[in-house]
Design a protein with these regions (language model features):
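The feature captures the beta-strand-to-loop junction immediately N-terminal to the Walker
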Residues: 40-42
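Helix-to-loop junction immediately C-terminal to a conserved catalytic motif
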Residues: 55
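Conserved ABC transporter NBD signature motif
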Residues: 63-73, 81
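Conserved ABC ATPase "signature" region
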Residues: 117-135
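Conserved ABC ATPase signature
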Residues: 139-143, 147
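Catalytic Walker B motif of ABC-type/P-loop ATPase nucleotide-binding domains
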Residues: 164-167
Length: 285
């Protein structure tokens, strides 16, 4: 375990009641402050269970989960952990609790007992950061799915978290909604140093992470940078997972004899490397 880790999982196992086998089995990982970690896995792999363990919604059957220095096994620290590690769920409608946007953002602060005079600027700042200020007095049901998720992010941001856990937060959104939510969380990660645990089944989202964990049958099977993980094309297929489109295309072109390097994730990567192969004199200048 890294001594400076923001989130640490130490030989963590978790078994649901009456389940024949553990959902997670002896998982160990360390997430550093400011890292953006993507977690991939097929349905039932254990990735959502991992999210709930980090947020102290679940307590491990074995092992320890430590968030910002707090062990989730200590019941007295649960609310402190949840203040520091905010969670965005899959369905935005399931986390809207008020009839006005600014009141929804205030909900978590009220539970923390934050004084009104401190609450108001924190709400305004949070909505400003996620670009939702003009909807402050709107009814949440009038918003798009992406806008609702940004309101949920504002509610977390107002509590000044160290960690954001997104449990398939873009799964129910259209492409434009997915883009705006990912861009918002990535911006918070880069400008405020908030650590992000981004659970997704969209490979292009995972390709933007600093590091990727791939979970299958409750165990971490692959770990590394997006380029390192997605270069295991055949192993990913064996785990019933895709890779980014450009990574898959590069793999097919290599099989046809084109000498492309590994680590191709985006259209820009592909264009650059194909140009090097087809026009070596041009790429050298």
């Amino acid at each position: 375990m890294l001594s400076d880790s923001r989130v640490s999982l130490q030989d963590v196992s978790f078994t649901y009641e009456e389940a024949p086998s553990p959902a997670l089995s002896e998982i160990s990982a360390a997430i550093r402050p400011g890292e953006f970690i993507a977690v991939l896995g097929h349905n039932g792999s254990g990735k959502s269970t991992l999210a709930k363990l980090v947020n102290a919604l679940y307590i491990p059957s074995k092992g320890n989960v430590v968030v910002c220095g707090y062990d989730t096994r200590d019941e007295k620290l649960v609310w402190e952990i949840r203040r520091r590690a905010g969670m965005i769920f899959q369905n935005p409608d399931n986390q809207i609790v008020a009839t006005v946007v600014k009141e929804d953002v205030a909900f978590g602060l009220e539970n923390l007992g934050v004084p009104t005079e401190e609450m108001i600027p924190r709400i305004e700042q949070a909505l400003s950061v996620v670009r939702m200020t003009k909807y402050m007095d709107s009814a949440p049901h009038m918003l798009s799915g992406g806008q609702k998720q940004r309101v949920a992010i504002a509610g977390i941001l107002a509590m000044e978290p160290s960690v954001i856990i997104a449990d398939e937060a873009t799964a129910m959104l259209d492409p434009s909604g997915r883009k705006e939510v990912l861009e918002t969380v990535r911006m918070l990660n880069q400008t405020k140093g908030i650590t992000v645990l981004w659970i997704t089944h969209f490979m292009e989202e995972a390709a933007q992470a600093d590091r990727v964990l791939v979970i299958t049958d409750g165990k971490i099977e692959l770990e590394g940078t997006p380029a390192e993980v997605f270069d295991h094309v055949e192993k990913m297929k064996e785990m019933h997972l895709d890779v980014p489109h450009m990574t898959s295309l590069a793999d097919e072109l290599r099989k046809e004899g084109m000498p492309l390097p590994g680590g191709i994730l985006t259209v820009e990567d592909m264009a650059r490397e194909v140009e090097k192969v087809l026009c070596p004199s041009k790429s050298a200048t």
